[in-house]
Amino acid sequence: MNRKIIAIIPASGIGSRMNAALPKQYLTLQGKTILEHTVAIFLNHPQIDKIVIALSANDQHHQHISLLTSDKIQLVNGGASRAESVFNALQSIDEHSWALVHDAARPCLKRSDLDKLLQITDQNGAILASPVVDTLKRAEGNKISHTEDRTTLWHALTPQFFPTALLKQALQQAFDRQQNVTDEASAMELAGYQPTLITGSNSNLKITRPEDLALAEFYLMHSLEK
């Protein structure tokens, strides 16, 4: 199937839970920023035609990253939320393409997982995800209400992969209805689609708290040694 695949990286957040002087995507691992590690995954993949990165309008840090000057990369202004940043990025790409949305703070994506996801051609799209293995408790305040059945529960990861036109339509519909969407799949679900779950590695963690940095560095070091 001959189709254009555009990677979209929303990177306009500040990562307040990191308690760092810089937005978390500009913290360094193995001598490179988290954003550089993330972008390189797609820059080096032969099936990715273009990368669109949504940055805060006030972001000055990206100017010091030479990797972002590649002809394959386009920078756009992000929005007030992740969904708005993705929507802004979608405006700049061909509606006949497929959009591959990935968190800027997930630098440990495995090439094999990405390759599995890119095989999807179903118009419902697909996401990387991992089955829930922990016992989950529903709470009322700080008290346990009941235990959830985890057998059908998955952790949503990224990338998330959808036809561009359908994703744009789904996000616009969610905005119009003032529905809260925390990822692209939730917008597609609200629009009536059923994305496929593709099992991804647990090493594809999202760096959110300071302790995540050491684990991400371990995974990156391990992948470089192979």
Swiss-Prot record:
The record marks R150, K206 as: Positions MEP for the nucleophilic attack. Its EC number is 2.7.7.60. The record marks R17, K24 as: Transition state stabilizer. One of its GO terms (molecular function) is 2-C-methyl-D-erythritol 4-phosphate cytidylyltransferase activity. It comes from the Bacteria. The keyword Magnesium does not apply. Pathway: Isoprenoid biosynthesis; isopentenyl diphosphate biosynthesis via DXP pathway; isopentenyl diphosphate from 1-deoxy-D-xylulose 5-phosphate: step 2/6. GO terms for biological process: isopentenyl diphosphate biosynthetic process, methylerythritol 4-phosphate pathway. Keywords: Isoprene biosynthesis, Nucleotidyltransferase, Transferase. It is an enzyme of class 2 (transferase). Pfam families: IspD (PF01128). It catalyses: 2-C-methyl-D-erythritol 4-phosphate + CTP + H(+) = 4-CDP-2-C-methyl-D-erythritol + diphosphate. InterPro entries: IspD (IPR001228), IspD/TarI (IPR034683), IspD/TarI_cytidylyltransf_bact (IPR050088), Nucleotide-diphossugar_trans (IPR029044). The keyword Transferase applies. Catalyzes the formation of 4-diphosphocytidyl-2-C-methyl-D-erythritol from CTP and 2-C-methyl-D-erythritol 4-phosphate (MEP). Belongs to the IspD/TarI cytidylyltransferase family. IspD subfamily. This is 2-C-methyl-D-erythritol 4-phosphate cytidylyltransferase. The gene is ispD.
